[in-house]
């Protein structure tokens, strides 16, 4: 008993890490696409969420391709959060590719190739295939191994359903699959005749009393009914980019695992497009246009915008969502100014969704959700102070202060975060406004201080006055 007392019990470390938007589960809309006040991690921005819900409906129907949506608003107004909510609402079946506007600049790949790959990653292809399977409960399994230990293994298996029972001879390959899956009498299995893949569905209910105790992973299922051999339709979902990589001779399918795909020739893409269209006409495949989300879209230059103008008109284009926090600014690569740093001809093709700054009540609710997500206990007074800090500084600064304040409270072994913890963190870590103020006060003491810039600023102030 003394040895048992010394055993240390530790919690299993969580694999899911807490990110900036990990608390978002969807757009928080009801059945008629009306935005709830607080739902699925989303707070406020009712008009923007309602508009995003309509875009999700367009994507789900899959009939309209090549639409471009711009999420425009001030910093910290939830543009990326809405995009994450859209990805969650669409689910895993719809391809959703997220990238930043600066990701396309690389020495290994040109800009248009990076955009082409991102666009094709966002288009899914559902390929339908009919396969023959054997499905039933294993009654008896017998494997004969050579006495020498080397050589071919042979065996027999008896599989049954509620209506019939059949014996099968097993070859070496299928025996290896059986041993890998640890198949034994009483298991309900499926065998794909084409590929030889063996899948264990669970154990039969009739064998539930075989063991006094079973693991949590043991699943009990009914014995299958009808014929042993059945035809089953299997749907494989792949993206056009994955098909491109597999058919690219210079890389092959191994590049999918390495990630180093390089540039893919346009001829390969044209052949794949024609083949996919052929499958579509024959009913073998369905095209599932997804979503490409480009954050910080003002970082794209004039060449990228020109390429997107042409790409959006293609019938194989996904729905493109861009987000930017810029006002009237220069288009990158030119000296011309434009709203959001995007050319007028591309803006004309866009549907613009505006996000507005959060109210003090909404900021408090967001901070409360973030505290729950980060598993931090906070009292009401501290939450009000944190909300006031978020209003005066920024929402991001307040969210980042939650974790640091939690560490301060744990250090003094407190059960929850208090106002004193928030004050301590506020004094230790500067926000952008206080940092800028200190820079202006002590700018003469910093290296490479440009006095001419300050003189020019003073001259501009004199002119405006």
Curated annotation (Swiss-Prot):
InterPro entries: AAA+_ATPase, P-loop_NTPase, RuvB-like, RuvB-like_C, RuvBL1/2_DNA/RNA_bd_dom, TIP49_P-loop. It is an enzyme of class 3 (hydrolase). It catalyses: ATP + H2O = ADP + phosphate + H(+). One of its GO terms (biological process) is negative regulation of canonical Wnt signaling pathway. GO terms for cellular component: NuA4 histone acetyltransferase complex; nucleus. It is found in: Nucleus. Gene3D superfamilies: 1.10.8.60, P-loop containing nucleotide triphosphate hydrolases, RuvB-like helicase, domain II. Its EC number is 3.6.4.12. Keywords: ATP-binding, Chromatin regulator, DNA damage, DNA repair, Helicase, Hydrolase, Nucleotide-binding, Nucleus, Repressor, Transcription, Transcription regulation. GO terms for molecular function: ATP binding; ATP hydrolysis activity; ATP-dependent activity, acting on DNA; helicase activity; transcription corepressor activity. ATP binds at residues 73-80. It comes from the Eukaryota. Forms homohexameric rings. May form a dodecamer with pont made of two stacked hexameric rings. Component of the chromatin remodeling Ino80 complex. Acts as a transcriptional coactivator in Wg signaling. Proposed core component of the chromatin remodeling Ino80 complex which is involved in transcriptional regulation, DNA replication and probably DNA repair. This is RuvB-like helicase 2. It comes from Aedes aegypti. The gene is rept.
């Amino acid at each position: 008993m003394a040895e048992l007392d010394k055993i240390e019990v530790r919690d299993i470390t969580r694999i899911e890490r807490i990110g900036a938007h990990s608390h978002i589960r969807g757009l928080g809309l009801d059945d008629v696409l009306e935005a709830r006040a607080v739902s699925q991690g989303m707070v406020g921005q009712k008009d923007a969420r309602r508009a995003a819900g309509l875009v999700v409906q367009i994507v789900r129907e899959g009939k309209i391709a090549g639409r471009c949506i711009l999420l425009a608003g001030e910093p910290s107004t939830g543009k990326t959060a809405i995009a994450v909510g859209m990805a969650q609402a669409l689910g895993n079946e719809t391809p959703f590719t997220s990238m930043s506007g600066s990701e396309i600049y690389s020495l290994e790949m040109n800009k248009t190739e990076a955009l082409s790959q991102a666009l094709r990653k966002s288009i899914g292809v559902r390929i339908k295939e009919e396969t023959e399977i054997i499905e039933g409960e294993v009654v008896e399994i017998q494997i004969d191994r050579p006495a020498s230990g080397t050589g071919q293994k042979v065996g027999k298996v008896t599989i049954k359903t509620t209506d019939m029972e059949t014996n099968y001879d097993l070859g070496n390959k299928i025996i290896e699959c059986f041993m890998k899956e640890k198949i034994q009498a009483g298991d309900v299995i499926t065998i794909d005749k084409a590929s030889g893949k063996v899948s264990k569905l669970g154990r039969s209910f009739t064998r539930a009393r075989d063991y006094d105790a079973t693991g949590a992973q043991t699943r009990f299922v009914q014995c299958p009914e009808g014929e042993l051999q059945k035809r089953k339709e299997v749907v494989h979902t792949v993206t056009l980019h994955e098909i491109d990589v597999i058919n690219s001779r210079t890389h092959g399918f191994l590049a999918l695992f390495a990630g180093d795909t390089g540039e893919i020739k346009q001829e390969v893409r044209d052949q794949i497009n024609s083949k996919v269209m052929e499958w579509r006409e024959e009913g073998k495949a369905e095209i599932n246009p997804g979503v490409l989300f480009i954050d910080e879209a003002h970082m794209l230059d004039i060449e990228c915008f020109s390429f997107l103008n042409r790409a959006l008109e293609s019938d194989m284009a996904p729905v493109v969502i861009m987000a930017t926090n810029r006002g009237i600014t220069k288009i990158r690569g030119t000296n011309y100014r434009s709203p959001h740093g995007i050319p007028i001809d591309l803006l004309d093709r866009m549907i613009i969704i505006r996000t507005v700054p959060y109210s003090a009540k909404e900021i408090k609710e967001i901070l409360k959700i973030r505290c729950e997500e980060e598993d931090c206990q906070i009292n009401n007074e501290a939450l009000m102070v944190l909300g006031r800090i978020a209003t005066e500084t920024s929402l991001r600064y307040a969210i980042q202060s939650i974790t640091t304040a939690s560490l301060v409270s744990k250090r003094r072994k407190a059960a929850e975060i208090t106002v004193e913890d928030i004050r301590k963190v506020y004094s230790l870590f500067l926000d952008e406004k206080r940092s800028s103020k200190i820079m202006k006060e002590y700018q003469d003491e910093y290296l490479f201080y440009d006095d001419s810039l300050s003189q020019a600023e003073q001259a501009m102030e004199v002119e405006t006055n």
